[in-house]
């Protein structure tokens, strides 16, 4: 999940998939969003966001500063950002909450022909590498 700030200071959550995020190294990520989306507009305006990664026992909040990149020639509708990791907060169930686990979560179901879906995801990953 990606949380950006709208112009009024309210958090705006958005779902992102693994295909839209590419780790460049330990401190930099590349993010691809639909160019006309609210999250891309918010990130361009504020330059800050928080990525949330959660599994059964751990939740990580990755605070990032984002810089808009030029569009990829192969993906004109894609807004690309380079994200620099500013801080990482880890959250585990401890104390009275010890043993509590996230039992289920958000799952993206890529519908359609599997070959077409794989091609689309590969295209997106390639555009992030440009």
List each model region and its residues.
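Binding-site signature for planar aromatic cofactors or substrates
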Residues: 1-130
């Amino acid at each position: 999940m990606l949380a950006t700030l709208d112009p009024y200071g309210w958090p705006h959550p958005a779902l992102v998939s693994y295909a839209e995020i590419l780790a460049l190294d330990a401190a930099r990520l590349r993010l691809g969003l639909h160019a006309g989306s609210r999250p891309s507009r918010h990130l361009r305006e504020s330059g800050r966001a928080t990525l949330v990664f959660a599994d059964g026992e751990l939740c990580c909040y990755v605070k990032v500063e984002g810089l808009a990149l030029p569009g990829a020639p192969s993906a004109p509708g894609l807004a690309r950002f380079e994200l620099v990791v500013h801080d990482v907060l880890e959250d585990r169930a401890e104390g009275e909450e010890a043993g509590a686990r996230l039992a289920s979560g958000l799952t993206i179901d890529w519908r359609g022909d599997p070959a077409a879906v794989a091609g689309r995801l590969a295209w997106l990953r390639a555009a992030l590498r440009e």
